[in-house]
């Protein structure tokens, strides 16, 4: 994806949506939700990508992650403890309607942008302009040098080895019993 048009995050039911408009302005909404999936489904109703032959399977949409803790929205009976809760957002997604895809098999770069159907002619012209800007960036963009990454702190395991091994054995038992998968 290239230049997200929206960022969606949720932690403990606190859903934040940041829309990034073409002119660079931003609109942020925050709301308390019981299940963030409802908001995601509503957003996805506005964005549909056709499946086209000779195109990658991903031509735009949501990219990101759902943490392990996201299960609490679908299975509220599960009581997550401080020991099991990770220090991550429950979900962190970005909406991309511009994609630079590398087809390694055909040795081609594909530039993709979404077109909204409300005002098709104006939307098509905007898409042409975006595609030209993307092509110019690839052809003329400057290579950015980054310094080597350095760890800011020592990597430490979250649990001692013995405790971790016990947790794995317990999980295997639950899998065998059909309680988890």
Where do the PLM segments sit?
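Extended accessory regions or peripheral subdomains of proteins
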Residues: 1-32, 68, 72-181
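Short acidic (Asp/Glu) patches
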Residues: 36-53, 76-87
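Short, flexible active-site-proximal loops enriched in glycine and acidic residues
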Residues: 48-56, 139-146
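Short hydrophobic "helix-edge" motifs at membrane interfaces and signal-peptide entry regions
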Residues: 54-57, 167-169
């Amino acid at each position: 994806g290239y230049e997200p048009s929206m960022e969606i995050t949720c932690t403990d039911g606190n859903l934040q949506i940041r829309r990034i408009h073409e002119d660079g302005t931003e609109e942020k909404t925050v709301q308390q939700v019981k299940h963030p999936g409802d908001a995601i489904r509503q957003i996805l109703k506005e964005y549909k990508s056709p499946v086209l032959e000779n195109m990658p399977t991903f031509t735009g949409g949501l990219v990101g992650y759902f943490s392990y803790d996201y299960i609490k929205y679908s299975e509220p009976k599960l009581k997550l403890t401080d020991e099991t809760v990770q220090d991550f957002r429950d979900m962190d997604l970005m909406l991309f309607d511009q994609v630079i895809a590398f087809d390694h098999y055909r040795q081609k770069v594909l530039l993709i942008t979404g077109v909204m159907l409300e005002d098709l002619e104006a939307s098509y012209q905007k898409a042409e302009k975006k595609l030209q800007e993307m092509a110019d960036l690839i052809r003329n963009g400057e290579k950015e040098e980054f310094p080597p990454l350095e760890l800011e702190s020592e990597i430490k395991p979250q649990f001692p080895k013995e405790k971790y091994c016990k947790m794995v054995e317990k999980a295997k038992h639950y899998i065998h019993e059909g309680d988890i998968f």
